[in-house]
């Protein structure tokens, strides 16, 4: 997990005077640390250092437990909203039949519509290596069929006995 920034609370604050902000966000001016601590204690709340680098440091009167809980909740919601982009792989062969090709194409379309990247792998066996143009033609066909919903991120290239192309979803949808 990420290192969370630690706010100093109550007696942990070391500055002789602070810029005090009330619990409703209203500025109460620059006061001594003791006066600020007394104001927080009278309200039954904590004195929390919000901006330690300011001159003088900005401190706010608030319920620190509630503040930490709200921060955790915000961080959790932000994590939930992030979309993990996954790379889905579809494997083809130079001699893939039409029906199989259509099924794989439908899967590729579904992956792209869900916002995932797709890695199209075309595997060569035996003597097929001598006729790589068939494989290239197959990948060009995939590229043409997915033109309206995807864009080629990595052009077809050979890696060992397979040709690989990466397609990502189009942004302007």
Curated annotation (Swiss-Prot):
Record-stated family: Belongs to the IF-3 family.
GO biological process, one term: ribosome disassembly
Keyword S-adenosyl-L-methionine on entry: no
GO MF entries: ribosome binding; translation initiation factor activity
Protein name as catalogued: Translation initiation factor IF-3
Origin species: Aromatoleum aromaticum (strain DSM 19018 / LMG 30748 / EbN1)
SUPFAM superfamilies: Translation initiation factor IF3, C-terminal domain (SSF55200), Translation initiation factor IF3, N-terminal domain (SSF54364)
GO cellular component: cytosol; membrane
Role summary: IF-3 binds to the 30S ribosomal subunit and shifts the equilibrium between 70S ribosomes and their 50S and 30S subunits in favor of the free subunits, thus enhancing the availability of 30S subunits on which protein synthesis initiation begins.
Localization of this protein: Cytoplasm
Subunit comment: Monomer.
Keywords attached to this entry: Cytoplasm, Initiation factor, Protein biosynthesis
């Amino acid at each position: 997990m990420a290192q969370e920034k630690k706010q100093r609370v109550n007696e942990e604050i070391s500055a002789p005077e602070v810029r005090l902000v009330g619990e409703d966000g209203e500025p109460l001016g620059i006061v001594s640390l003791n006066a600020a601590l007394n104001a927080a204690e009278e309200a039954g709340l904590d004195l929390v250092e919000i901006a330690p680098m300011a001159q003088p440091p900005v401190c706010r009167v608030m319920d620190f437990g509630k503040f930490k809980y709200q921060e955790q909740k915000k961080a959790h919601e932000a994590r939930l909203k992030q979309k993990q982009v996954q790379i889905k792989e579809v494997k083809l062969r130079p001699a893939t039949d039409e029906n199989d090709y259509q099924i794989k194409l439908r899967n590729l379309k579904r992956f792209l519509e869900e916002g995932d990247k797709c890695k199209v792998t075309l595997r060569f066996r035996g003597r097929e290596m001598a006729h790589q143009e068939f494989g290239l033609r197959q990948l060009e066909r995939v590229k043409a069929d997915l033109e309206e919903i995807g864009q080629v991120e990595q052009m077809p290239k050979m890696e060992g006995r397979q040709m690989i192309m990466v397609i990502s979803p189009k942004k302007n949808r």
